[in-house]
């Protein structure tokens, strides 16, 4: 098992897992946790895996509870558009689009010593909050992993970009700028190349792009599990 703590954290992984540290955190934690989307990923020793992404959209969602179930209903219908020419226009019987994008990636086997032919093996579980930028963030970290050979920690910590634009931005009234926000750790050559292609850039701080990616990479050949969490928020990767 390989675990990785965020580069800006001063807390060691072993001490963070201790009962003493847990009691310290419990004593200082806010009794009123922040709202917004939450994602976690879990893989156990038997290969069972979960990627859970929870969101009710706005704080308190629709502010309606389903009967006596205690389940708070979301207000994702704020994603509807009223323009009849828009693909996400409000219509009877139509399901609103949403941005929830948990990921499980599998490796297809053509054969092997285990005798499995055409089987699939789980190699990655990941996800992030971030509204419209969820797909963008997952695209970037998976590309880093698959095409550039990074491990999960490198993929999560690599410089990142994000973009939203009108009129496709999800949240009503669906109006925003059309800037490409890029972290300033990208090289000047890359920034110049983007501008030469017509992108309007907004250079932001080194860890200010969207997302709080959590990733677990499974190596079926070695039996190793590697985890990483985004240093842009308060995520953590830990194993036992």
Describe the residue ranges of each PLM region:
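Single conserved hydrophobic/aromatic residue that forms the stacking wall/gate
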Residues: 1-17, 21
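Short beta-strand element of the conserved SAM-dependent methyltransferase core
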Residues: 4, 104-105, 216
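Hydrophobic aliphatic residue packing
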Residues: 13, 20-21, 43, 50, ...
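Proteins synthesized as precursors that undergo proteolytic processing into mature forms
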Residues: 26-207
């Amino acid at each position: 098992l390989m675990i990785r703590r965020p580069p800006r954290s001063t807390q060691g992984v072993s001490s963070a897992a201790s009962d003493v540290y847990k009691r310290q955190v419990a004593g200082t934690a806010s009794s009123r946790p922040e709202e917004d989307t939450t994602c976690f990923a879990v893989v156990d020793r038997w290969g069972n895996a979960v990627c859970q992404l929870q969101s009710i959209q706005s704080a308190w969602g629709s502010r309606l509870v389903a009967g006596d179930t205690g389940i708070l209903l979301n207000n994702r219908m704020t994603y509807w558009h009223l323009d009849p020419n828009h693909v996400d226009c409000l219509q009877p019987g139509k399901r609103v689009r949403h941005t929830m994008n948990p990921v499980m990636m599998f490796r297809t086997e053509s054969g092997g010593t285990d005798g499995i032919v055409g089987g699939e093996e789980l190699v990655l579980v990941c996800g992030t909050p971030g509204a419209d930028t969820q797909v963008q963030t997952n695209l970037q970290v998976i590309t880093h992993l698959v095409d550039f050979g990074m491990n999960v920690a490198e993929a999560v910590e690599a410089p990142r970009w994000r973009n939203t634009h009108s009129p496709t931005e999800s949240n009503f009234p669906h109006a925003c700028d059309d800037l490409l926000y890029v972290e300033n750790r990208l090289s000047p050559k890359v920034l110049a190349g983007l501008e030469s292609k017509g992108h309007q850039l907004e250079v932001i701080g080194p860890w200010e792009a969207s997302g709080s990616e959590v990733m677990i990479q499974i190596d079926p050949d070695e039996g190793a599990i590697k985890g990483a969490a985004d240093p842009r928020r308060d995520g953590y990767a830990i194993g036992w």
